[in-house]
Amino acid sequence: KEKDGNKRVLSGVPDALPSLIQASRLQDKARNVGFDWEDRGDVWKKVREELDELEEELRKEDKEKSTEELGDFLFSVINAARLYHLNPDNALERTNQKFINRFNYIEDHSIKACKPLTEMTLGEMDELWNEAKQNENIK
């Protein structure tokens, strides 16, 4: 606690944290003082609301407002993860690794076929992507 005893609830969350982790910590602090969903299932209405607002701003092609709404959407998804005791940072790391593995699968096939990625159609790449995905499910 600060020496003057006038500490704010969210003041202990460092600004230097990566945004995803900072969002999780801010939500934890708010929860600790009772600012939380009574029923965690209700969070999905908020996630959908934020997604709708993002889509609306994207249609308007307003980059500033779209960026703001993207942040709101991401914050709500991170909040949902917290409510379901899921670590959003770990989840994103796993997804990044899946993307790398699947893309590398496409690239490996392009090398074997002596066909540069830039000469492959999206359909060909999608087909290989789905093969990579199926191979993951077999393991």
Feature roles, as predicted:
Residues 1-70, 75-139:
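Flexible "arm" and connector segments at domain edges
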